[in-house]
């Protein structure tokens, strides 16, 4: 999603969320503040920028506070800049995200009535399998999936790590295959030249 300030436009991932997000993700503002309950209730046009987005648009991250950016052809005021965090378990760069109130996104920006994902923060004593089953049951009921396959997926941090490992293994395997093919083609080329030289 493009975000613009003056003549500068950068691409960002918009994350529409609640004020509880920093506590759930252990990811907090370095400058300014995060989204407040009043922002959510009043559908305020405010955003919190990831560090890299703030740097690309305004230079020093702290200079982004109070400035306006253009998203969805609407003006939003920057109220905070997040701390540097790097990539998450899925490989997404969290410093290139932009946060806005969920209500603002759904009603004023995207005009949609559904959400694409939810983070759950579990108590250490919680049974992960029970939580997964209960969450799945709620989603299946809400999505009217009786007798049908799930139209959603649930990932734990361990699942994300496994998916990332499998993706890296696939890349390494493809790299090894490519190297082998290149070596074989190169060997055939050398053999052809040697045969030609012998025939000559």
Regions flagged by a language model, labelled:
Residues 119, 146-181:
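Peri-transmembrane interface segments
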Residues 4-5, 89-91, 164-167:
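Short, well-ordered secondary-structure micro-motifs
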Residues 13-39, 43-148:
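Mid-to-C-terminal secondary-structure elements
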